[in-house]
Amino acid sequence: MNFIKKVIGGGSSKSKTDIKIEDEQHEQQHEQQHEKQQIPDKISTSKVNSPCVPPTCTYISKENVRSDLSLIKDFNSAYYYNYYRTLEKNSTNLLTSPGLNTKVVSNQFTLKEFNIVSEMTDSCIVSVWTQKYSNLSLTPVEAVYQIPLAPYATVSDFSVILKDKVLKGKIKENEKAKEKYNDAIASGGQAFLAEKVEGFFKLQIGNLPPQEDVTVNITITSEIGTHLESLHFCLHRFIFPKSAFKFNYTLNASLSTPIETIEMDHFQPTITYKDESKTNATVTISTENGVSNNIIAIIVPKYSEKPESFIEYSPIDKSYALAINFYPKFSVGLDEVDQKSEFIFVLDCSGSMSGKPIEKSKMALEICMRSLNENSKFNIVCFGSNFNKLFETSKHYNDETLQKASEYINRIDANLGGTELLEPIVDILSKESDPEFPRQVFILTDGEISNRDKLIDYVGKEANTTRIFTYGIGSYVDKELIVGVSKACKGYYEMIVDNSDMEEKVMKLISIAMQPTLSNIKVDWGVLSNVVQSPAQIRPLFNQERMMIYATLDKEPTEKQVTVILSGNGPLSERISFPVDLDFSKANQSTSHIHTLSAFKHIQDLEESERKEKKDNKDKIVKLGKRFGLVSKHTSYIVTADSDKVTEETMKTVQVLEPTQQINTSPGSGSGFIPTTRVQGSSSVFPSSPTPLSGPSPYTVCAPPPPPPTSSPYTNCAPPPPQFSRCIAPQPYQSAPAPPAPPAPSRLSQAQSQMDYCDQELLCESLEGDLLVEEEELECKEIECSPPQKLSYITPFAPTSQISQSSRECRSKKSSSPTIQKSSSLPSRPSTSSSSLIEIIRQQKANGSFTKSSVSSFINVDTPPPSSDIPEDVWTTLLIIANFILNFDSQKSQWELVSQKATKFVKQQIIKSSIASTFETLLESAKKSISN
């Protein structure tokens, strides 16, 4: 018996216009909220019951792992969607593409029917696209279109049905495939070419005779999109023509654990569970009006506390392929975390940072330095027209390097001219990362750079080795630089408009970076031999991330039941092992999906080796492409057929994704790219740089912002050149100097420049509208919501808890992190000055302790401890923690990590010195001493 969740006969009864309007409203609401949700909530510190028992990592209960559904559905925050987010951001670049204004008769070559059948498992998804085209032209045509092909997807099969003949595509080297295509066209025959071109899938249907129909079958193999504990499958609206056509979609999900929920916005699908176990489900959609919205299937499986494995067997070559899927969660107090990590802070020291921005940044850096633990490595990089570094390479964190960092920070000034960020980032990321110390980079900047897209493309290629956090300072910062760089490397970002809260916002991201991590992950394959693992280097598993590993075995294993060991460095700096049981006797023989995806991931490793190590892996890539039928940078699919009648007429070239006179600007309207007619010899409608969207658009939205009396009427417009100041400060490891910076423009000239710029660009608002809705600044004041709702805190490695709606509505879009209600059992006191707090924090040693002599000018340290067995530095550190709680409650975000490190030191000393009192008892005594 089938279990039906929803049954909707055929497609939705709503008109296409109604759907578009609803989609616009949904997308606008969604964009206004997703930035607020993109940073995980702060995590409460769990208490240790006994001071004499070392903390341990344990799995958390299933009841604590489920995220709020609105966060699970927030696909904009998912890493896999960053590719499409970038396309959406830059889709208006195509307004300047050649041939935009060329008119194509829409009924010459049309898509009549589009069917997609997808097979989803826990590790991969394979989709077969069947597209039926009709050529009503009186002359032969060459049809050309390109669709986005995400970097985690590839074409793995290709065939054509022409005149009732099924023509199977063959993988060839790119050059040979193109030669064969051109030869077939020149001889009057038909040809079909499928290839991957710089991030897009390009399909050419050549020399299709008049009045002939053709059916194209394409198989796309892809990794599963993941977000929090959910699995996503996205069919972006940009892949569909804007015309009406019949569309049928079937998704067959077969998971290893029961399915808890299936969600799909914009559509009312039929969802059928095959049995009561709910491990298998079928989702179907049908419509006669084409597709104008994203199709995103969101499946939430039941949480599994252990790695899951999936095995395939290929009887053709007697090989096995397997996938390992793991979403770990640990329960460990933040003051107990002692994991290794590398922290690199990159600070903008251009002239425009002079004054309060650079001073506040230096204060924030001082706090960051005291928040690191002794298992860290770190470095500081200052950049402008050139850059310099604290150390040539990152150094281990100790009292000596901490002192050098403080001296270096004290010398920092806004004296480095312009804003050239690419060079220092390349210098950082080109150095081989240490898997023992996961690399995390923090960038603080207030400007914009000329090579933004090149930078985003570059850092995106390093996402497996590095996580990047970004801070945008001030009103003139390039927001897409801040958002794009962080999302490309699976990091987070903050927009800092008001310098007064800079330290708080900087520490929010530092707190995220400190959350428990599983790093230096390796698989011990044991008795298995000739294992090809991909990716070869496994990315560290940060909070709320899922790991996917693939492997192929060309030989039969000697044993049918094998246990391999997945291991990594845990949050307590210990080595943690997870056994993974493999039963080869139960291998699936009906599909080759994991074989294909494993080969694709291996090809990606080889291509990355070509990029970084300059190796020539073309022969290996071509061999894998031919064996598994994969399109790559070196391989394409080709189909040729001799025509019954040689075509001698002139062939017309048309775009399948045909242009339209009316430019839809809603992000939910399915407008996407503005396609154009392809004429012989013209360049592609799509950009041709390594990044699908490189190159700044000459069109910029300058929609007027809301008019609060204190804000400039031009704050949303493109800024004039940044202001510079000139001064000299000694800096170690100076890079090559740059020419002198230009003189600073006056504020009046800046405002006039903005006014002139916006006057020239008002046309863009009507052209683009909501396409760049994420760029619109909703000038909501950052006020304390009244009354704010408390958040229910969760343990480390648990997904974000729900954020109250009132908090979301009160937040500014310039801040992407959720508003957190501070919890304290003590009443709030008037805060002492921020400078006083910074001076206290500066006295902390690398191990987290404070000495009596260093803090005697800030607090009364002469109060004796409650017992004589308490060492002086332990009691002094307790007094400082109590002082933070009692006198700096309103600045908790600044000292919270400093206090956690101090707490960790005290707890370690309690165990080491066999002190009878618990930490909580001693802290209460310290509070009483501070209060007296």
Swiss-Prot record:
Residues 677-686 have a biased composition (Polar residues). Residues 15-39 have a biased composition (Basic and acidic residues). SUPFAM superfamilies: vWA-like (SSF53300). It comes from the Eukaryota. Residues 815-834 have a biased composition (Low complexity). Residues 1-49, 661-752, 800-834 are annotated as: Disordered. Coiled coil: none annotated. Pfam families: VIT, VWA_3. SMART domains: VIT (SM00609), VWA (SM00327). Residues 342-521 form the VWFA domain. Residues 95-222 form the VIT domain. PANTHER family: VON WILLEBRAND FACTOR A DOMAIN-CONTAINING PROTEIN 5A, VON WILLEBRAND FACTOR A DOMAIN-CONTAINING PROTEIN DDB_G0267758-RELATED. This is von Willebrand factor A domain-containing protein DDB_G0292028. It comes from Dictyostelium discoideum.
